[in-house]
Amino acid sequence: IVMPGLVDCHTHLVHGGTREHELNMRLAGKSYMEIMNAGGGIHYTTTKTREASFDELYEKTYQHLNDFLRHGITTVEAKSGYGMNWETELKQLEVANKLQQNHAVDVVSTFMGAHAVPKEYKGNEDAFVKLLIEDMIPKVAKLGLAEFNDVFCEKGVFTPAQSRLILAAGKA
């Protein structure tokens, strides 16, 4: 029997923590930005991902890939973006690349350092954009860690102008 494999084209595969505790907030009508501004959302997962070791992330994500495969998914895009600093973004991408080598599911990495503005750059968003453009994106490219570059263009996160700069840097 031959069956097609499914593709999950938008996952943040490698991350620490879970956010099911935010479900009640969503059910109560809170917006994504309200949850994030209250310390949840991306910032919560960023904290948990920064705290997790390479091995913890690898083992957890390997099990997730087993679940994907059981449901017919044979290819996933693995976005980073829960580090928002070089060390953790690198850790996420290296975990994804090791999984690509060791798991039956095809893992295609996307650098998404521009998932949110880290708390330490609040009020100085342009400095973070500059860090992404001048430092992080070139390092990812030089090391061959990702096939793609992405940005979260949303009110309160990255503006269209900032997003264009980030995406252009990824093409360079």
Regions found by a protein language model. Give the residues of each.
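Metal-coordinating catalytic core of metallo-dependent amide/deamination hydrolases
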Residues: G41-K60, N66, T74-A172
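Metal-associated gating/positioning segment near the N- to mid-region
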Residues: I1-K60
